[in-house]
Structure formats: C-alpha cells, structure tokens
C-alpha cells in the first residue's frame, strides 16, 4: 500500500487558532459554523463580540457563549499530530501551580503520565500491539482503583435556586472534580428535582448563563478567580433566548 508523507506545515491552518496563531489548546468549536479556536482565546474574544472570528457569522445576539462547545476530537488530533505539545502544555500548567505555591491537581499529573506512556513505546520501537495491550492494562487498572476523579483538583459549589417555579436542593453544598462540566451539574439537579429533562435548566454564575461544556475549573478561573470558595451558582427554568 502506497503512503504519502505530509509536512506539518501543510496542515497548520487546520490545527491552529486564528486568534493567537498557536496550536489549539482546549479546542472549542462554534456550533453555528464549526470553526475552532483555543477556549481561552474564544471566550476572551466573545466578551466584546458576538460573531465568529473567522467567518463573522453572528453566533448569538446576546449569549454567544451558550453556542460554543469543547471539541475533544479536535484536541486529540492536535496532540497526536504535534510532537511534544501535550507534554509542554502539562508542564506549563505544573509550573503555574508551583509558581503560586499550590499543589498540582491529580488530573494534570495523570494526563502527564498518560502522555509519556503514549509516546515512549514508539520511541523504544515497540509494536502497536504492545501499545494497545498496555493501554488496555492501564484502563483495567484504573477501573480497579475506582478513583472516580477523587484525585482531581476539587471545587466546592453552592447550588442555589433563584426561581419560585423550582424547589431548592436539600443538600445544596457539593464538592466535585474541577473537570466536571455545567452539563454534569444540570443532570445532577434534574435528577434530584425529578425533572423530565436536564435541558429544562439554566445554570448561572454572577447572573450570566453558563455554557453546558464549560468545566468548573474554567468557571472558577474566569468568573470566580478573586472570590472565596465556595463557587456560588444559581439554577432556574430554561429561558428561550431571542
């Protein structure tokens, strides 16, 4: 079978962020036009704009952040195509925590180890079969440990209801992984309140509706950075945005 080698330079336009011109980190896609950017770059841009940076289509007149989503597939592709990018990003995050004198979250440590395990077999000339068996063994080990993200960086949250149409939670104080998303919280609240669908809810921070794919870590960094724990979030029945 014939193979064709392609230089990384030839596909750079497809795996770089138009806003910062760097390789995509925490890739986030606009649902209207499917253009992808770094999450931090896109969120910062949408604080002052409501159009796509590439095609200028209006994402939403008033709540554009509701119509962007984390693109895990694209991020995986970027990490696989660009040698050392994932390790470099994890190193930057570790240095950031060390600089602040904070403990490095378990999820960052785990991703670093995972990246090394993914790269080392190929450097040593091992076969793909060996790589697959190692991956399966690692997944089985993880299931046996039953950690359930307890070693991740944790976020303390207070979930308050600000609508008379819904009742408050009996236990409004929760603690969960910083990698959990707003969607996870919606499902949790819907289950506790016996709602027919989690899509019937909006979750807000500082009176701003949060996108379903926002991680709690992202919310803390962008909406709660200089405030004390717990992170205060409000929920209400979903309102149709015009």
UniProtKB/Swiss-Prot annotation:
Residues 132-242 are annotated as: Interaction with BCORL1. Residues 115-149 are annotated as: Disordered. One of its GO terms (cellular component) is nucleoplasm. The keyword Transcription applies. Keywords: Metal-binding, Nucleus, Repressor, Transcription, Transcription regulation, Zinc, Zinc-finger. It comes from the Eukaryota. GO terms for molecular function: histone H2AK119 ubiquitin ligase activity; zinc ion binding. Residues 117-140 have a biased composition (Basic and acidic residues). Pfam families: RAWUL, zf-C3HC4_2. A zinc finger (RING-type) spans 17-56. It is found in: Nucleus; Nucleus, Nucleoplasm. CDD domains: RAWUL_PCGF3, RING-HC_PCGF3. The keyword Repressor applies. Component of a Polycomb group (PcG) multiprotein PRC1-like complex, a complex class required to maintain the transcriptionally repressive state of many genes, including Hox genes, throughout development. PcG PRC1 complex acts via chromatin remodeling and modification of histones; it mediates monoubiquitination of histone H2A 'Lys-119', rendering chromatin heritably changed in its expressibility. Within the PRC1-like complex, regulates RNF2 ubiquitin ligase activity. Component of a PRC1-like complex that contains PCGF3, RNF2 and RYBP. Interacts with CBX6, CBX7 and CBX8. Interacts with BCORL1. This is Polycomb group RING finger protein 3. It comes from Bos taurus (Bovine).
């Amino acid at each position: 079978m014939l193979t064709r080698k392609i230089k990384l330079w030839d596909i750079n336009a497809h795996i770089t962020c138009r806003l910062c011109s760097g390789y995509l980190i925490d890739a986030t896609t606009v649902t209207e036009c499917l253009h992808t950017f770094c999450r931090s770059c896109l969120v910062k841009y949408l604080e002052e704009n409501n159009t796509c940076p590439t095609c200028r289509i209006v994402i939403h007149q008033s709540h554009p952040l509701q119509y962007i989503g984390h693109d895990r597939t694209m991020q995986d592709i970027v990490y696989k195509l660009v040698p050392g990018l994932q390790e470099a990003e994890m190193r930057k995050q570790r240095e950031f925590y060390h600089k602040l004198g904070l403990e490095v979250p378990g999820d960052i440590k785990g991703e670093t180890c995972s990246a090394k395990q993914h790269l080392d077999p190929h450097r040593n000339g091992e076969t793909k079969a060996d790589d697959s068996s190692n991956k399966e063994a690692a997944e089985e080990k993880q299931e046996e440990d039953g950690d359930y993200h307890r070693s991740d960086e944790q976020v303390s949250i207070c979930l308050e209801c600000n609508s008379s149409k819904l009742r408050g939670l009996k236990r409004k104080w929760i603690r969960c992984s910083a990698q959990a998303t707003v969607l996870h919280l919606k499902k949790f609240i819907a289950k506790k309140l016996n709602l027919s669908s989690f899509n019937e809810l909006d979750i807000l921070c500082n009176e701003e509706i949060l996108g379903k794919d926002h991680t709690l870590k992202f919310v803390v960094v962008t909406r709660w950075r200089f405030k004390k724990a717990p992170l205060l979030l409000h929920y209400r029945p979903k309102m149709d945005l015009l």
